[in-house]
């Protein structure tokens, strides 16, 4: 039996391994783990053995028959070649002589060893002692294989792999237990320099709408790329890069591509995660090679998508590798604009024809100054501060949530579909607050699907109740559908159907119900359709809101003509619950066309230290990115309660953060604040000073005239619900039961009276009931109680004396 005796514990193992090998003639090397798996599948008694222990036995059996896995032989050959470079030829010859003297039967193997050790039978000559010394060095090299791998990252150069053609007669089928042994391909080190190459961008500024202000800022930052000589006269280093941030889907990557396309400069683009590797030191090497590639192709623009994935804050990084990657990015950015290495003076001297001598030096901005790095991220606060300092990503360009005008411009760029005559882009822009470019693109795509379904149902499925068809009817409809699909593709056949295949306004309305805008994905609410016409009464409060928020946006020129500061103001709406404070805030945002962020007080509270403050910063940052914007804090008393002396709890920290954001060093710019509360007496006094919440408006209980207006607006002038001919709003408003009713109570009154009218029509089979009558309102008024008790009404009357609007006293004559 070749290789020695069998296994005492399992004499049949070695013959079975040999039998398995004979199944694959021509195969030279086998993997022990694959052979062990095949044997366990063939022989049930091996399935009960531990796979790791059994694999060791199979490995020993393969070693006995001198068939070691190719990976192990490759390692030995690699080690031998490495040592050949440093050892003398006589020592290697002595080792070969010594190996020839050693018999093959003298190999001693173990279950853990990957290669057998040889037994020395010759005398100890000088050459043999040198050979043994060489073996010790090889063993030492084995134990230090991890360090050798890292060393190769910095010493070996990646060479393009050359495909080798294999003759057909030499191609053999790979058995399950055979080693594939593919040629070693270069890993991620060479991937950046070999596969990432500059390319042209076909996106230009004209393809992006609503970002003219940002484009103007980019042109100032990229001046050195198009006019390097002009910029060099300033004698300052050019900008190395900037960060583009905004909510997901706002067009950050497309914006960066448009910069390269408009300036006609090649770009290098890749996701930041493509640089991440599991081998220590490889990620840093990829970054270095990427920046070297950018320098070699200067001028160019380097785009790193989602840069926060590889550049998190170092103080919160969980692994040391993340800190090293951030440090490497900082170093690579610094090296973009560095003076070149000093050359010998003789290489810098030039002699003219007239005998003059001049010193020619390279421009310090010649190598990497033509590289502009653009990083995109949805979380700028998550990027390490070292990258955001001056000299690196010192500029940040915000692409916030577009306003109504910007949305209309975006729709003009992306809407290439066939629209019906009743559709205008201005209408769609007004119905899509909180939508970014990707959301608008999805809306158009969804509206097209709705139009296709509508036309399809009209042409093919004539029956409107096709969802309740029987099995035979479904089969018949399916045959009709297939016949239409397999017919001639003639679009003119649809011209008779409502003017052809067009997207109507109704299609957009149906599509709006299925698309979730970016503002809602971020946790912020939007206001689609609340206007002053939907709000009854509250005339004085509406006037104050218009002068504080509406006119500074719509009549900014008049403010400037009189020299009035147009700074954003804050309003605190207080009063009993249900009087329309939230509706007022929504209507203000809708009338101005501004973005609207609704924040309920408890939503920002978090049990973890620092998370509540971070949520406040996020809200204000989103508002600044989407300015002009209105932030509405509902139940603001839960956010900013009064602080006691010396308090240092989480609530106090949250109040401090909110105070800083409201009136900090940076300012709010065009961010308006509206707060609503039922308890202004427990709100911290620092919030109520001018500059934060400038005015306090008390929203009182509606009077009789106010109740008439609320009833008329809530019923859409008697159309929703349908009202009877005997309805008199003044009579209803004067009912004694309605004393102390709020606007929400009146809405509940209308709903209850509608249900009573429906019950009379359905349960009593009284088809003469065509709408809600006076008797239904009277019965509903007797059932509903006011939401604010008498004791609470007295408290709000006292609050009105403190915070209510003071009436101007007439001048004395």
From Swiss-Prot:
Origin superkingdom: Eukaryota
Low complexity bias: start-end ranges: 175-191
GO MF entries: ATP binding; ATP hydrolysis activity; preribosome binding
Nucleotide-binding as UniProt keyword: yes
GO cellular component, one term: caspase complex
Parts forming coiled coils: 58-89, 122-152
GO biological process, one term: lipid storage
Compositional bias per record (Polar residues), positions renumbered to this chain: 158-172
InterPro entries: AAA+_ATPase (IPR003593), AAA_ATPase_domain (IPR050168), AAA_lid_3 (IPR041569), ATPase_AAA_core (IPR003959), ATPase_AAA_CS (IPR003960), NLV2_N_sf (IPR038100), NVL2_nucleolin-bd (IPR031996), P-loop_NTPase (IPR027417)
Gene3D superfamilies per the UniProt record, alphabetical: 1.10.10.2010, 1.10.8.60, P-loop containing nucleotide triphosphate hydrolases
Effect of gene knockout: RNAi-mediated knockdown causes an arrest at the L2-L3 larval stages with few adults reaching adulthood. Abnormal presence of vacuoles in the intestine with some intestinal sections almost completely degraded. RNAi-mediated knockdown in a ced-3 (n718) or ced-4 (n1416) mutant background causes a similar arrest at the L2-L3 larval stages.
Annotated positions binding ATP: 246-253, 575-582
Record keywords: Apoptosis, ATP-binding, Coiled coil, Nucleotide-binding
Membrane spanning stretches: none
Disulfide bonds: none
Keyword Coiled coil: yes
Family: Belongs to the AAA ATPase family.
Protein role: Probably together with ced-9, plays a modest role in preventing ced-4 and caspase ced-3-mediated apoptosis.
Protein name: Protein mac-1
Organism, scientific name: Caenorhabditis elegans
Gene name of the record: mac-1
